[in-house]
């Protein structure tokens, strides 16, 4: 019996030690511990809501202790209320450093930071940084030279390339400010005003296509091509073409792989069927002949509609006959699809969402005008309407002559620029979530807000894309 009493005292001592060190006692959950039992005391007081009781066994026998533990209620026992001990609370840095000198605190913090961060894995660091929002990433680069040099790191470039692509940005030229571009970031709903110093200042240069974070520019005289990353100012002037084309041309761009490190291709095609392909790896234009004879010449392209790229294939919109012209950058094959457009349609352009080919246009009946979205059905080669702008927004266009420009060549986000004599609107449409969002006006430097986009292209922002 003495051994049992000693073990019980040891148990009580351990519990008291736990209480003294700050560990919370287990809550009383047994229904037998009630106020009706003389051997146990349960206090219900605001000050002791978490209080609990232990028997005082200094003056009791082992039998009494066993009776208390095993047969509560048969014999009276003496109890001692222990002071309520709250769970440990995390102290603030000010409380932890209270009473220490500034030198001691700085030494502790410095040693702690050095010990933690000097062993931080570089691959994990790059993996975290690659997931930062683009605007935050460029602020992050200003911290030190090492972080600024990340965009030149091959491992960081691979890490960034493996991430799923985010919603695209839009490089635009406003109607009255054709000498500089404005970039819209839909995630922040903010306009940026990048400067690409290498672009010629004396001629008008327009954005024509994009791939992998790079934007392809063409001067208004159709003489020179340029490729640049608007975020990092990486720039390349493409070599002169093998022959001059003075007519209007359509321009498309694709990647050779999943990033610009594998190279990219640029295609231009003229109305008479002539075309050339530029490969960044060889840095030359290749003349691959003319469009096959089974495709009607002249090629009447809808130049308001930008070509869209799905994998390695470019799609152009035809006006006569109505349909789509495609070119595979890998196989070099042209195809033509006769696809009649929806009736009462105007200002229509192609758009892409993943592997889906979309059509965006103005549908006008009587005096009512609305923006509609169609998707090409691959089995029937017919356009199927999948969405249209909310009616309350369409009412703004009632009785007005509306014109529209559309940028939707990358990602699943489409930027619409709508104007009439009385109004201008900028709107984005998400083809995945089917959300319509109004876009704030673009404030041109030293100018007022502009709500009309003359031309532009969508592109996926990339800090690692190199021209």
Swiss-Prot record:
Ranges of the Kelch repeats in the UniProt entry: 163-211, 252-305, 406-456
Domain (F-box): residue spans on this chain: 114-163
GN (gene name): FBX6
Organism of origin: Arabidopsis thaliana
Entry annotated with the keyword rRNA-binding: no
Taxonomic lineage: Eukaryota, Viridiplantae, Streptophyta, Embryophyta, Tracheophyta
Family matches, as PROSITE patterns: FBOX (PS50181)
UniProt xrefs under CDD domains: F-box_AtFBW1-like (cd22157)
Protein name, as recorded: F-box only protein 6
Keywords: Kelch repeat, Repeat
Record's keyword annotation contains Repeat: yes
SMART domains referenced in this protein's UniProt entry, alphabetically: FBOX
One Gene Ontology biological process: leaf vascular tissue pattern formation
PANTHER family: BNACNNG10540D PROTEIN (PTHR31672), F-BOX DOMAIN-CONTAINING PROTEIN (PTHR31672:SF12)
């Amino acid at each position: 019996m003495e051994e049992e009493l000693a073990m019980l005292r040891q148990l009580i001592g351990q519990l008291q030690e736990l209480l003294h060190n700050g560990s919370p006692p287990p809550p009383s959950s047994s229904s037998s511990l009630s106020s009706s039992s003389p051997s146990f005391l349960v206090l219900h007081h605001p000050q002791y809501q978490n209080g609990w009781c232990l028997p005082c066994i200094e003056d009791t026998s082992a039998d009494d202790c066993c009776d208390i533990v095993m047969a509560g209620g048969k014999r009276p026992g003496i109890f001692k209320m222990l002071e309520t001990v709250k769970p440990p609370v995390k102290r603030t840095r000010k409380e932890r450093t209270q009473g220490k000198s500034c030198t001691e605190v700085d030494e502790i913090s410095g040693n702690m930071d050095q010990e933690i961060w000097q062993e931080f894995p570089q691959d994990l660091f790059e993996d975290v940084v690659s997931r930062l929002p683009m605007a935050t990433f460029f602020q992050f680069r200003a911290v030190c030279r090492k972080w600024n040099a990340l965009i030149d790191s091959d491992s960081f470039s691979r890490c960034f390339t493996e991430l799923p692509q985010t919603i695209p940005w839009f490089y635009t030229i406003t109607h009255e400010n054709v000498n500089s571009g404005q970039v819209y970031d839909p995630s922040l709903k903010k306009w940026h005003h990048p400067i690409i110093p290498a672009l010629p200042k004396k001629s008008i240069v327009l954005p024509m296509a994009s791939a992998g974070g790079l934007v392809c520019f063409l001067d208004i005289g159709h003489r020179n091509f340029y490729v640049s990353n608007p975020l990092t100012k990486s720039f390349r002037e493409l070599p002169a073409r093998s022959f001059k084309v003075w007519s209007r041309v359509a321009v498309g761009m694709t990647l050779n792989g999943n990033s610009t490190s594998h190279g990219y291709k640029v295609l231009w095609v003229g109305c008479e069927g002539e075309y050339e392909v530029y490969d960044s790896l060889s840095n030359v234009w290749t003349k691959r002949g003319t469009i096959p004879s089974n495709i009607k010449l002249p090629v009447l392209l809808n130049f308001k509609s930008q070509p869209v790229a799905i994998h390695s294939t470019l799609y152009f919109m035809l006006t006569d006959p109505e349909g789509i012209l495609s070119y595979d950058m890998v196989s070099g094959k042209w195809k033509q699809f006769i696809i009649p457009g929806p009736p009462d349609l105007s200002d229509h352009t192609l758009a892409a969402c993943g592997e889906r080919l979309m059509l965006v246009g103005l549908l006008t009946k009587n005096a009512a005008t609305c923006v509609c979205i169609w998707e090409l059905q691959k089995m029937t080669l017919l356009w199927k309407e999948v969405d249209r702008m909310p009616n309350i927004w369409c009412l703004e266009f009632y009785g007005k002559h509306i014109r529209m420009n559309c940028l939707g060549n990358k990602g699943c986000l489409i930027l619409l620029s709508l104007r009439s004599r009385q109004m201008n609107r900028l709107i984005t449409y998400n083809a995945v979530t089917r959300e319509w969002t109004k876009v704030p006006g673009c404030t041109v430097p030293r100018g007022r807000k502009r709500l009309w986009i003359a031309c532009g292209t969508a592109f996926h922002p990339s800090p690692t894309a190199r021209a």
